[in-house]
Amino acid sequence: MEYINRFYWLIALCLIISTGANASVNPKPFVIPELKEWKGSDGAFVPTEATKIVYAANNPELERIARIFAQDYQTMFGRSLEVVQGKGAAGDFIFSLRADKKLGKEGYTIRVTDRVALSAPENIGVYWGTRTLLQIAEQSENHQLPKGTLRDYPDYPLRGFMIDCGRKFIPLSYLQDYVKTMSYYKMNTLQIHLNDNGFKQYFEHDWSKTYAAFRLECDTYPGLTARDGHYTKKEFVDLQKLAEQSYVEIIPE
């Protein structure tokens, strides 16, 4: 009987130790889309006034991504982070390029220890990684990041959305904001439907009576554009350039 009691006490002790060990491991952070791989450790990285954003290579695009991250961080959290080139140290965000065939073109790795090391095979992966960092940081008052290692990559090369501006004019400012929102959630394609007729059921089911809207400026037929709103060529090109900076492709049709 004494042997059995000792056996049960031993099992209970193992369960307690196991539960305590698991409790100290950080769970997978909530990110949209869901992270592919996560190996948690314990503790958290908390940015300080001395935290810098360090890009590790003489790469103009990597520097641009670092500055976009700094700008977004300032906008979202009200804290200014210095952007520098170098190796980085404890307390810093460190961005670098590193070959990894398993990650593909858009994948990335983030290791959170006493620093945050974000690496990817290509610049676009680093950019998507910054969106993940912002999403996680947004979820706590001190913008901490749980310590651990994550690897992430998309399931689909095209992650898109189509918006109908033909039947209903949508202001340019809304489209600009929409591009930024799409990029935040790693969507990379926006198809803009520019020309169409209204739904015929509202016009006696007669297509010839429906309102035909052409939303993009036309040099060949200057009077063709819709009376209730359109985009100039320059406005639309500028929108496409803005989207490119966030790795979003705009497809007009």
Where are each of the predicted segments found?
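Bacterial N-terminal signal peptides that target proteins for export
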Residues: M1-W9
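Feature activates predominantly on carbohydrate-active enzymes
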Residues: K102-E253
